Every structure is written in C-alpha cells, then in structure tokens.
Design a protein with these regions (language model features):
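N-terminal twin-arginine translocation
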Residues: 1-9, 14-29
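Short helix-initiation/N-cap motifs at beta->coil->alpha
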Residues: 70-78, 126, 183-193, 206-209
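Short, well-ordered beta-strand elements
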Residues: 32-41, 66, 91, 153-157
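Short, polar/charged alpha-helical segment
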Residues: 46-62, 166-173
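Extracytoplasmic "Venus flytrap"
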Residues: 36-49, 72-73, 158-164
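Alpha-to-beta junction loops
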Residues: 85-93, 152-154, 196-205, 218-220
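C-terminal lobe and pocket-closing loops
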Residues: 125, 210-228
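Hinge/capping helix and adjacent helix->loop/strand transition within the periplasmic-binding protein
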Residues: 84-90, 104-190
Length: 228
C-alpha cells in the first residue's frame, strides 16, 4: 500500500512510465477499477490530455480507469477530494503546474501539495496559446498590448484563480505593463466561450482545447508559450 496519494503531473518527461509494470506486479496492483480525478472541467486541456494518456494506461494495467471531472477554485476542489480517498493507488490525480502554484493563490489549503501526494507518471507538457476574438483585428501580441494600454479596461479569462491559464495571462500582463481585470471560470471551455462571444478580451489557454477553435476561425492565436 502506498503511504501517499498517487499524483499524475504534467511535465516534460515520461521516464516513469516503463517502471509501471514492475511496480504493479510487486504490489499486486491494481485490484479493482481506478478513479482518475481531473480537477478541471470536461473539455479542458488537462482533461483532453488526461483521457489520451489514461486509455493506453488502462490497457497496460488491465483495469478500467474512470475519469471524474470536478472543477473549481483553480483545481483545488477536485484535488482536495483525492486527499480524502484511501491511499492505495486506486485514486489518481491528473494535475498540472497549478498544483505547485496553489499555495500562492490559496494560502489556507486543506492539503499539502508536496507531502500529501506521490508523483508517479510525468507525461507531457501543454503549451498555452494567447487567443482573441477575430473581430478584435489583432495580429500580434504587440497589438493586444497596445490596445490594452490605450483602453485601460481590458479583461482576460482563465480556468480559475491559481490555474496555469491564470498565471500565464498574468505574466503576459506584467510583461506588457498594462492593466487588465481577471475573470475566472470553472474551466477552460467556459473561458474560451466568453472570449469567442466577445465578452472577455483575451485568454491564455492550453493548446489542446484552443486549437480546434483556432482552426475553425473562431479565435485568433497571437502567441504560444513554447518554441513550437
């Protein structure tokens, strides 16, 4: 039995994956259906990537993995529910950089992001993309920054306070030196919907959830947070 909850985190490496069969055999794991918690809304970048990874993992382990979405409070609500589960490896948490940043946004967390979890499968990175409504007429980030400075009333959407999308947009705001009001939602899909509707000026969202909307011409991409 593990002494800490199992934690699936988004990172740049996947070296822990090959060790899974040996670990499972040694501990006779799993013995029943596995629950994988995604602490953000269905359709969010983390949800999309999590489902892609859980499918082959389920086949490899020979056990069903049921994904549960419980968004809100920058991922801390769903994460807190995992802490309360039996620490036997049958409840997994699929998280991202928001996990380590949570204490900065929520000083009174009911759990410790480090001590209460064991990171077992780092499996990828999701670059953020800055997107706006096509009607804005922006072609570059410089266009957005110039308009924001001139307006003084810009808004940006995120998947919640303390989410990776929140920090990405806030970093862009600080680097650009303009003021903008943060409008948090329970998940990325809601944030993208508001930008598409023109009710919020921009968002820095995970590429996996924003890309289909960019390809359909519903959003315009201004910048990507990677070299790709």
């Amino acid at each position: 039995m593990t002494t800490r909850r199992t934690f699936l985190t988004m990172s740049a490496a996947a070296l822990a994956m090959p060790a899974l069969p040996r670990i499972a055999a040694a501990q006779k794991y799993p013995t029943r259906q596995i629950r994988a918690m995604v602490p953000f809304a269905a359709g969010s970048s983390l949800d999309i990537v999590g489902r892609i990874v859980m499918d082959p993992l389920s086949r490899q382990l020979g056990q069903t993995i049921v994904i549960e979405n419980r968004g809100g409070a920058g991922g801390t609500i769903g994460t807190a529910s995992v802490v309360k589960a039996e620490p036997d490896g049958h409840t997994l948490l699929i998280q991202a950089s928001a996990h380590s940043a949570a204490p900065a946004a929520y000083p009174k967390l009911s759990y410790d992001p480090v001590r209460d979890f064991s990171a077992v499968i780092p499996f990828g990175t999701i670059p953020n993309v800055t997107v706006v409504h096509p009607g804005r007429g922006f072609k570059t980030v410089q266009d957005l920054v110039a308009a924001a400075k001139k307006s003084g009333k810009f808004t940006y959407a995120s998947a919640g306070v303390g989410s990776a999308t929140h920090w990405a947009a806030e970093r862009l705001r600080l680097a650009g030196g303009y003021d903008a009001v943060h409008v948090p939602f329970k998940g990325g899909p809601e944030a993208l919907t508001e930008v598409m509707a023109g009710r919020v000026d921009f968002t820095c969202m995970g590429m996996s959830s924003a890309l289909p909307l960019i390809r359909d011409g519903k959003l315009v991409a201004l910048a990507v947070s990677s070299a790709a």
